[in-house]
Design a protein with these regions (language model features):
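Glycine-rich, aromatic-bearing surface loops/beta-hairpins
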Residues: 104-116
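N-terminal low-complexity, intrinsically disordered segments
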Residues: 1-45
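Amphipathic protein-protein interaction modules
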Residues: 31-102
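Residue-identity detector for glycine
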Residues: 10, 20, 39, 59, ...
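Short secondary-structure junctions and interdomain/linker hinges
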Residues: 19, 23, 49, 110-113
Length: 116
């Protein structure tokens, strides 16, 4: 498995943490300050996964509604699409910045759908 195999998970969880949807103990300052990459954050603070206890109620509701569609759309993000496999996507803040546009749009769609 490529070293960047969990990049897609790290990008999503980092977005949640950076938007106040992770519990405080899963939103370290080193992530907010971009001292670690989203993938490093996932490995160090989330044991390579997203668990409900790590998220706020809003974070859990959004993740339940949007994570599977996010996985389907992740490969369409230009920075991701240039690779043969989504598992080759680099774990960088440049990647995050492009992927965050997708997640933000999905969040806005979700908020509209729930009347928020």
């Amino acid at each position: 498995m490529p070293a960047a195999a969990s990049t897609h998970i790290g990008m999503f969880m980092a977005w949640l943490a950076l938007h106040g949807m992770a519990q405080p103990d899963h939103a370290p300052s080193e992530l907010h300050e971009r001292m670690i990459t989203p993938g490093e954050y996932l490995r160090r603070h989330c044991v390579d996964q997203i668990d409900p206890f790590m998220l706020t109620d809003t974070g859990n509701a959004f993740t339940s509604a949007a994570y599977r569609p996010y996985l389907r759309r992740f490969g369409d993000v230009p920075v991701v699409a240039r690779y043969d496999s989504t598992y080759e996507t680099p774990d960088t803040w440049e990647t995050y910045d492009e992927v965050a546009i997708l997640i933000e749009a999905m969040y806005d769609e979700w908020r509209s759908a729930i009347g928020g």
